[in-house]
Regions:
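Active-site neighborhoods and metal-handling regions in enzymes and metal-associated proteins
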Residues: 1-361
């Protein structure tokens, strides 16, 4: 964690920000290692404090040894009062707060308590998130394990699926397989969507039967030590029809073109275009209604985001970096028939990308 603190402190110095209050759970875990459900970090050029309540005192000692504990006691010593005390002690006049992760109620409580204090709150965005986009060796090792658990689960379950099973039964089988394979839990509610239901990119499993000869989208991932996997496959039980073969072939080719073209310094919207242009040329551009991919790590959706840029801003978007881990998931969705999506996770390397997902497709 010392390296992460050093990198954050360099960013704070560059921005002229003397301190940052880190409250987003994923950012808090990334910076400290603390996995509890309640707490915040105050990080300055010299100090690293963690505020949490009595439930987590022992846990902080185990998970966040680089941080000094300040215990929250409700209602006597809330976070806002502890923050004022620490700010005065550290001679702070400005503290950055994560604007995207502080609710109106939380901001009101902080502002009310600190109204007469010399400390000013400065809303900032994306500071820790930008550091998290490039994975270190420890993160990659955990991600590889989570992905392997996911791959093994879908590989084991698909041969067991039958047309007379429901979507919910299939989803449960996949969840059990990931638990038995070593996952802590699931990264998100598993999607199993058959036939017309698969035209909904974020469908939820129902009591509808899987059936024969129609598309079945499976979207799943194991969560391990805080890190997410994400995998989509489209299968067919029985003999697929001509339309399935055509749509599947287009989506698979689009994904392969994207994977072949990913590399550092490529703009994220240009990465999206690697697949989107092929799908559009095949006549299904309007049926590919989401971005090509998203970063995956401590959050299931994080940066970088591989999607179209706003008109006129195509040359101003963010670029891929070596160390990014991103999903690559083109899809085509036809109302009344169904959809096809194929998703793998890819690591951006020095000269291209490595496909981390290994399940058959």
């Amino acid at each position: 964690m010392n390296d992460r603190l050093s990198r954050l402190r360099a960013v704070l110095a560059e921005r002229g920000l003397p301190a940052l209050l880190v409250s987003a759970p994923a950012n808090r875990r990334y910076m400290s290692g603390f996995s509890g459900s309640n707490g915040a970090l105050l990080i300055t050029a010299e100090a690293a404090l963690i505020f949490t309540d009595g439930r987590y005192v022992i846990q902080v000692g185990r998970e966040a040894p680089d941080f000094s504990l300040r215990e929250i006691v409700i209602p006597d010593r809330p976070l806002s009062e502890l923050l004022i005390e620490a700010s005065v002690e550290l001679n702070l006049r400005t503290v950055g707060i994560e604007a995207a992760h502080v609710s109106v109620a939380e901001h009101y409580a902080l502002a009310k308590t600190m109204f007469d204090s010399p400390v000013e709150l400065d809303p900032v965005e994306g500071i820790v998130e930008s550091l998290r986009e490039v994975k270190d060796a420890d993160e990659l090792a955990t991600l590889r394990k989570a992905i392997a658990i996911t791959d093994a689960a879908i590989t084991a379950v698909i041969p067991q699926l039958r047309p007379d099973m429901t979507e919910r039964q299939a989803a449960w089988m996949l969840e059990v397989a990931m638990h038995e394979g070593g996952g802590d839990t699931i990264s998100f509610p598993i999607i199993v969507a058959a036939g017309p239901n698969s035209a909904l990119p974020h469908a939820r499993p129902s009591n509808d039967l899987l059936g024969e000869g129609r598309p079945i989208i499976i979207d799943m991932g194991a969560l391990l030590d805080g890190y997410h996997a994400d995998l989509s496959r489209t299968i067919c039980l029985g003999e697929p029809d001509a339309q399935f073969r055509t749509i599947y072939g287009i989506v698979l080719e689009a994904q392969q073109r994207a994977l072949a073209g990913l590399r550092p310094e490529l703009r994220c919207n240009a990465a999206d275009a690697l697949a989107r242009d092929y799908i559009t040329a095949a006549g299904y551009g309007e049926q590919f209604g989401h971005g090509l991919g998203h970063g995956v790590g401590l959050d299931i959706h994080e940066g970088p985001s591989l999607r179209r840029a706003a008109v006129g801003r195509e040359q101003n978007g963010p670029r891929l970096q070596a160390g990014n881990v991103t999903s690559v998931e083109p899809g085509i969705y036809l109302e009344g028939w169904g959809g096809v999506r194929i998703e793998d996770l890819a690591l951006i390397t020095a000269d291209g990308c490595e496909v981390l997902s290994k399940a058959d497709k």
